[in-house]
Amino acid sequence: MPSYTLNYFNHRGRAEICRMLFAAAGVQYNDRRVDCSEWTGMKTQMPCSMMPMLEIDNRHQIPQSMAIARYLAREFGFHGRNNLDMARVDFISDCFYDIMDDYMRMYHDKDGKMMFQRPYDNGNSSERRSRFQETCRRILPFMERTLEMRNGGNQFSMGDQMTMADLMCYCALENPLTDEGSLLSSYPKLQALRGRVMSHMKMSPYLKSRTNTDF
């Protein structure tokens, strides 16, 4: 088994999908959480000067959260079984990533610093919030319909096996639901899917014991 080190700030943020994949697979890794004060000195050492970044066997470096997530999903069996299934897992995951990305941009400052006040007035917060709300209006109905296409939406996104797509549904909506508890009130299939992820035999212990952060 390779050795893994996941580098990211002490947030769930863009690295949480990767942490959830490690938990779902039961694979050990070094969860290196970088303090914002350390980041300035480290930034130029990182590929693309960004995190998260996954190190494998202290030799290979993979930047970009979704590239890391797809790699781990393929390695651990949480991607599709064929190209068509992989495409479905990918587009569902990317749709939820769009929601998470627009949400984080409302609160993101720079160099890993997040503004925890809700809403955070950074001079253009109204524009960013409008963009996030429009993204939700565009994507959530589509995700509900997409889920219903598989077994009536009563299992996971790909059927009876949990995949990266289901984990993205959970982690991408975690903070938005904290801000607006009724966000999924019109999407019962998505609500139920998040419940299945939460009660999964590998995910339930992880979600109860993980480091508690605001984002």
Swiss-Prot record:
Domain GST N-terminal: 2-80
Keywords: Eye lens protein
A Pfam family of this chain: GST_C_3
Source taxon at top rank: Eukaryota
Gene Ontology molecular function: glutathione transferase activity; structural constituent of eye lens
All copies of domain GST C-terminal, residue ranges: 82-215
Expression across tissues: Lens.
InterPro entries: Glutathione-S-Trfase_C-like (IPR010987), Glutathione-S-Trfase_C_sf (IPR036282), Glutathione_S-Trfase (IPR040079), Glutathione_S-Trfase_N (IPR004045), GST_C (IPR004046), GST_superfamily (IPR050213), S-crystallin (IPR003083), Thioredoxin-like_sf (IPR036249)
Single biological process term from Gene Ontology: glutathione metabolic process
Family: Belongs to the GST superfamily.
Identification of the protein by name: S-crystallin 1
Organism name: Enteroctopus dofleini (North Pacific giant octopus)
Lineage: Eukaryota, Metazoa, Spiralia, Lophotrochozoa, Mollusca
